[in-house]
Amino acid sequence: MCGIAGFAKQSNAQTPEQLEVIRQITKNLLIESEIRGTHSTGIAIIDECKNPLIFKSLKKSSNFVKSKDWKRKIVPEISLESSVVLGHTRFATHGSKSLRNAHPFNCGSIIGTHNGMIFNHEDISVNKKRVYEVDSEAVFALFDANNNLQECLDEIYGDYALAWTRDNKNTLHLLREDGRPCHYVYWSEARVLFYASTKEILESAIEDACIEEDDGKGTAYIYDELWSLYSEEIHTLDVDKLYTFNTHKFTDKELVYEEKSYVTNSLEANYIMEHNYNNFNYDSFGYSQYYKEDWEKTDCDSCSKKIDYEDIIYNEDKKSYICYDCEYKVNSELDIQESM
């Protein structure tokens, strides 16, 4: 079980006050999503005018949003020009607990996050020279290699809720099958859509932002808009439907989007029976190995401090690991991973 959460908004359509609230709700969404995964936290920020930024950390989300990188590097990038933000909290199943395996994944034209389990990810043939350790990365690599979504879904057996963007930086895609939840709500005045794995996560994130505004940090009209948003109906994604949100079409009256039905192989039992997995159980996916508490340490090349791996943040845009203490690059070749 993982948490997916984020937003899609029309660029340059918000007031500075609305932008601050969007930042606060984004932070709250990650914190509330911690209940769905504590092994890593990640966020992708997509801007129509520049290259996407992806930040990953082995911190749980409540600690991630307290980090220096969150305050100094991530929050400023959530700007008026931002169009899509993809957030993720991971509970590791396939693949070790490492920054390399943390979401979001950048696979060519695709940046995506996934909640669920793909049972045949080792059978997905995208690159014969590459075996994907994480099922989620295999899915997005498949999406990148084939623009025909139905053909991609025909290859996938498992359960999933997916959030991704393609080359079109102003468009968010959401898709789920019956085994995984996903919900969204639209703030019309700010022309922004928020989404999360559960209705409760969305409600809590918005309610906490309302309380922040009530403490005198905001203005009266923002406070009124937020409570209006809190009372707005939270929508559930229909099963096996692709929702495409083009932020250029967002209005201050209604949410305009497209939806299209697909056929999915979502019943995990079918795949297990078909492949005669008589010994299928949670240990097949390595749950038991993720409860070890001892973390390896590494030396920072700049400040020579011994650092826990969870205190290092990976900046995917710069392909480098950043020391939490001195904020300088650690070692670009380092594969940070929990010792097993």
Question: Could you describe each region identified by the protein language model?
Answer:
Residues 1-340:
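Conserved short alpha-helical segments that host acidic/polar catalytic motifs at enzyme active sites
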